[in-house]
A protein has these predicted regions:
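Active-site-proximal or metal-binding-adjacent scaffold patches in catalytic folds
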Residues: 1-82, 91-126
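Walker B catalytic acidic pair
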Residues: 87
Length: 126
């Protein structure tokens, strides 16, 4: 289930990137709540996911989205879509959840809700 939902998350990001061309090429990985050196240089803690948007120069984690394995075990398609919309907004708008970030997140999430209505989002599960 983890690998299936991880692939779904990657496909949702590709769908989002097809509409929002300024999104960077991104790597999406899963890891446990503890520090996992080969996957990420930080801990994910209780958050479902986090983004490495301002990684150190030449860091291998730049533009990486890390998702908690526990979340991937039970997340629905729309929960994954909402999380990807959230983290993708962090890759474009640096910093905290300010007004600019909120607007960008809403644009991402509205696009994905529209994709759900027309059946495009379900194809991300294949």
């Amino acid at each position: 289930m983890i690998e299936y939902n991880l692939t779904t998350a990657r496909n949702i990001y590709k769908l989002l990137k097809s509409e929002f061309r300024d999104l960077p090429k991104s790597k999406i990985v899963a890891h446990t709540t503890k520090k996992h050196e080969k996957v990420c240089d930080g801990t994910i803690g209780s958050a479902y996911a986090h983004a490495h948007s301002e990684a150190r120069k030449n860091s291998r984690y730049k533009n990486q989205i890390c998702i908690q394995q526990k979340f991937l075990c039970s997340a629905s398609l729309m929960e994954i879509a909402e999380m990807i919309a959230h983290e993708a907004a962090h890759l474009v708008i640096r910093g905290i959840h300010g007004k600019r970030w909120e607007k960008r997140y809403e644009r991402h999430y509205d696009f994905l809700k529209e994709c759900k209505k027309n059946g495009e989002l379900e194809r991300c599960e294949e």
